[in-house]
Amino acid sequence: MKVLYITMALVLSCVVPTYSMSMQELQNTNHYEMLRGFGESGNGDGTYIDKDSIKASNGPNGTKKTAVTQYVLMPADDTIQEKQVLYTFNTNQSFANLIKKLDTHQLGSYKDLWLSKQKNSGISSSIIDFKVFHVDGNQYDAQNEARDRRMATAPVDFGFAGYLLANRLYERVYGVQFDDVVAK
């Protein structure tokens, strides 16, 4: 019997605490910021970012990278999606740089500028990690999470909610909107 108690004590001491996220936690404005105006994409009813998770770095050829943990409320399912996303910004594709190309006749017209921006917004993203929680904080099981991970995409198409969100993050990190950046 003593062996059983000792074994149980050892097992319980080795239990890894689980992480959860609830709506109540997202209301903590010291740690999370709600980004307004990004629910129109059909991808949820509000996007929050973890202020402490934002990490910025410079990449090759004038690119900048920003990693962030964001939470998207999904009211139809009573869930919160946690996404760790890496955004890559190609400053050569900012509006300011495209206008500069237009001025130096590297682009033929404003239509060419617009088509260039539509084809390549200059922002790409990839989901590094993805979890789903019920709004009460309980995490979904692994099978549902694996299915949801396959469905998770983060397109950054010019003019849509994902593009506006990425621009907002860029401004928060670098102090200027992405499209106002002129590469050297």
List each model region and its residues.
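Classical Sec-dependent N-terminal signal peptides that target proteins to the secretory pathway
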Residues: 1-22
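N-terminal secretory-pathway/extracellular module detecting exported/lumenal segments
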Residues: 20-84, 90-184
